Amino acid sequence: MEKFKELLQGEVPLLVDFYASWCGPCKTMHPIVEQVKSMLGDKVRVVKYDVDEYENIASLYHVRMIPTLILFKKGKVIWQHSGVMRAQELFQAVMGAI
């Protein structure tokens, strides 16, 4: 939790991918998130949290569906999406929010 708090307060926006290893749509999103991560470069930090392992963090942000992507800037939620989306849509949403 401390590492997560540090990441949240960083200068670089943080995109969190909440997923589960048993979730089919999460497996679909994995390569998409990785592709967008490389497209974003240093503009955004991307991390993944397994909701079964980090239930406290998922609960704190009311993650009810997976996959859920939440974009933070200086500790505040600035964008959120649940479900699968295409790489270009994700990239444009993140760039539009930051």
Residue ranges with predicted function:
Residues F18-I32:
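Conserved redox-active cysteine motifs that mediate thiol-disulfide chemistry
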